[in-house]
């Protein structure tokens, strides 16, 4: 069911980020912001993964249509655009150095340690880290919190 949350996040993103732009412009906006979070380290797009994700997406389409039927999406959500953004997001590539800088940016309260640029609001970082803690490890989601038994919760 984690894909449902990611698909909903894409639907919300499309509604909230530069609402008067097309899908390509929205993706470029997101890509550039991720690049800033990564301190301009390597951030790529794998078209083969994108095409594979789109060609084998029956379950994601079914989930999307289920969510649409139940009026879960914001008004005027285009399901195909939402799923395309989801597939594009699944097709991003980073290396370990890039991932380390992205993690360090979160650990540094939203300030990229390599550029010194404040790229995320502290409140957004707090929310992202909370989501990552509870449901950001895919099939291992939630289990980490119970095994670690953190007292910060």
What are these language model-derived features?
Residues 82-86, 90, 94, 109, ...:
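Cytosolic covalent-transfer regions centered on His/Cys nucleophiles
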Residues 16-19, 109-114:
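Short helix-capping/linker segments at secondary-structure and domain boundaries
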Residues 8, 93-112:
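Active-site-proximal alpha-helical segments within enzyme catalytic domains
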Residues 113-153:
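Conserved SxxK-family serine transpeptidase/carboxypeptidase catalytic domain
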């Amino acid at each position: 069911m984690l894909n449902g949350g990611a698909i909903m996040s894409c639907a919300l993103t499309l509604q909230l980020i530069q609402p008067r732009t097309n899908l390509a412009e929205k993706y470029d906006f997101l890509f550039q912001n991720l690049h800033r979070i990564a301190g301009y380290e390597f951030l790529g797009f794998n078209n083969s993964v994108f095409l594979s994700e789109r060609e084998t997406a029956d379950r994601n389409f079914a989930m999307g249509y289920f969510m649409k039927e139940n009026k879960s999406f914001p008004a005027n959500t285009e399901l195909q655009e939402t799923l395309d953004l989801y597939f594009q997001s699944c097709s991003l590539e980073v290396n370990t150095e890039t991932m380390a800088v992205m993690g360090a940016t979160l650990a540094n309260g939203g300030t990229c340690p390599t550029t010194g640029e404040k790229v995320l609001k502290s409140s957004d970082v707090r929310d992202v880290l909370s989501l990552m803690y509870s449901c950001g490890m895919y099939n291992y989601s939630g289990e980490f919190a119970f095994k670690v038994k953190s007292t910060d919760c």
